[in-house]
Structure formats: C-alpha cells, structure tokens
C-alpha cells in the first residue's frame, strides 16, 4: 500500500510543477509589457483550475485531481490550512497555498462551494464482485467487529457530505480515494486532533481500501448531490474538525 501511495502522488507531481512554473512565467511576462489581464477571482485561481477544472469539476480521466465543486466551504478552507501547516503533504499544493491569507482561502473556498456542475466518471479498476460487495458493506454498514464505522455514518446517508466540514465522497475517482486512505495510514495526510479518519484508515486492511475505493467510485449519483444539513448525523468517533458538538462548532 505504501508503494502505491507514493506512486499515486508521484505521477502527477511533475506535471503540476511544470504547470505552476508556466503560470508564474506567464504572469511575469504580462507584467513586463503584455496587455493587462482583468483582476478577477477566476483569473487569480487559474493555478487551482488548471488541475481541478474551470469550475472545480475535477479532471476526468486523471484519477488524481478531485472535484472541488459543491464541497462544503469550511472543508475546503481546512484542507488549504492543512497544506500550509504540514498536516497534509503534497508539494504542489503546499507551494500553491503557502502565502494565502485566511480571508483569501475563504474567498476561494466559497467560490468552489457555490459551483454546481455535472459530475464526470473516471475509469474503474478491474475488481471482483466479492471486492465490490465487501466495499459496499464497509461503506454502508462498516465492520463492527473491527470497530470500523460505515462511511455513511459521517459522510451522510447518500455520501454527499454534511455541512459545514464533511466532504462528499460520491463522484470521486478510485485512484484519488485509494491514495487518500493510504495517505492517512502513512501519515502524509492528517487534520486537527483527534483525527478520526486516521483512526479509521489504520483499521482498514489494504484489501479493504481497494474495496472501499472501488465501491465509492462505482456508486451511482443520488438525485440530490448537495451536502446534508449540519447536525443531521452523529459521528461515531471523536473528530477534531467537527468540534465539540459534532457539527463543526
């Protein structure tokens, strides 16, 4: 699993670095005498949309750059903060957000949270029916004997997320889901303590991670893909990002 996780991060790394360098070089060229570009939010977040899509829809076929559109704004802000403070490791993102103010991160997050664009589907890996069945069990019911809660117990009954801080899982690519679960196991992704996702990920086996990622990536989208209302779920584990009340406050 550790090898796969490193590969998942290594493949897009060089591409992202080249894109960031190209964008910065282009900005310097414009400053040197090219026509002035309007200073709009859309122009300033081009470094985001280059990988995550013009409206945060993700990058179909890549498997590595997740959808941002419609995610709770507080969740998106928290992820940028985690890249800033080292709780989440991915060099291109760490570089991109390193000097952003909290107010600017909130502005970016609110922009992407407000985007409502169609979902795209990424290719699925060849997995057995038994693997998909195991994944569906973990997603919907968990594994009480191993103290593994269901994904739905935190991410909502339709896995569309819960306001204000829990992201949706539907529509995410298999490669991204697998890589993130692996990152929690290898401590390259973390968040405010107590880190409930790190606890859950470390109770999953490598085969469980394959099963969960495959089951989530193959799920049909619900009719309503909006995040559930705050307070509509009771988390089964203490989660620092959800605060004392379990709803982010």
What are these regions (language model features)?
Residues 1-11:
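N-terminal secretory signal peptides that target proteins for export/translocation
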Residues 14-26:
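Bacterial N-terminal signal peptides
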Residues 26-45, 55-64, 114-144, 243-244, ...:
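Electrostatic cytochrome c docking/interface patches
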Residues 38-42, 56-85, 94-100, 152, ...:
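Gly/Gly-Pro-rich "capping" loops immediately C-terminal to redox-active cysteine motifs
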Residues 46-54, 108, 148-158, 212:
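The canonical Cys-X-X-Cys-His
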Residues 54, 96, 193-196, 210-211:
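Residue-level hotspots at or immediately adjacent to binding/recognition sites across diverse folds
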Residues 62-67, 73, 77-136:
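Acidic (E/D-rich), amphipathic helical modules within compact regulatory domains
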Residues 98-122, 134, 200-235:
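C-terminal capping alpha-helices of c-type cytochrome domains
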